[in-house]
């Protein structure tokens, strides 16, 4: 939607108790603004729906907007974007959602920046840390009876300290969805981002569950380690055809040959084309990563113990040689 949208917020103006600082971006349903609380000085992000005349399916857009706010306010976790308020401004009649402002950009931005600067893909340790944070968020999502359905690097944002936050619950689905939720879900045929979708999601969006989110997070891990998603460049039709044959994504070692074996196993387990062969719950990812960290720690201890033993032996040999010489 090019140019200014009539009736939207203007930088420098007021929106309730907030000063509008600037527009952060736009999407198909609305725009996001940076707001400042005039009383506390704190910054927030505000997602504002376009006026009714600007959105073709305004009723559905409002439904998705309110559902995102409802789910986000119901699911609390340090690695989920927090929504503080939702409503309709009495003066402008614009629908709004006030949430955390995350100045660190997205994971997608970080990956692209590293490639532009020729720094290569993300380090293993950083990639594992980020997967741990989002898997932890998924634990809270699952406990709340929700499936995210659109986990991708663009929906993982960073705060000022570099902590990852999962956002965009606009197409999330409750596992106990009623008829109203199903109507919202089925408005569009394709729900989510095809390059990150699990095979069952690509073939039938009604069959997704938390294991589909785990698959998508595995694709994000592959992207962090390789610099791009494994199926980059494939069309949606090609992705669906591949999903129907239950074909695995390419081996990460074709892009990064010297990855630790346990990381390769983690990726294969997260991205199995068959849901029953994946981790069944995000807690299992955390357990796997705990075991990986402990194994790595023990290996380092054994390595340094070996180095110390060799150093001691060399020192003793040197002393013995000196004594023999005298």
Give, region by region, the residue ranges found by the protein language model:
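Conserved N-lobe ATP-binding subsite of Hanks-type protein kinase domains
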Residues: 31
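AlphaC helix of the eukaryotic protein kinase fold
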Residues: 50-74
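Activation segment of protein kinases
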Residues: 56-59, 161-163, 167-199
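A short, aromatic-enriched beta-strand patch in the conserved N-lobe beta-sheet
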Residues: 85-87
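Conserved short submotifs of the Hanks-type protein kinase catalytic core
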Residues: 92-106, 110
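Activation segment signature within eukaryotic-like protein kinase domains
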Residues: 130-131
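Protein kinase catalytic-loop region centered on the HRD/HxD motif
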Residues: 136-146
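C-terminal lobe helix-coil module of Hanks-type protein kinase domains
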Residues: 167, 193-294
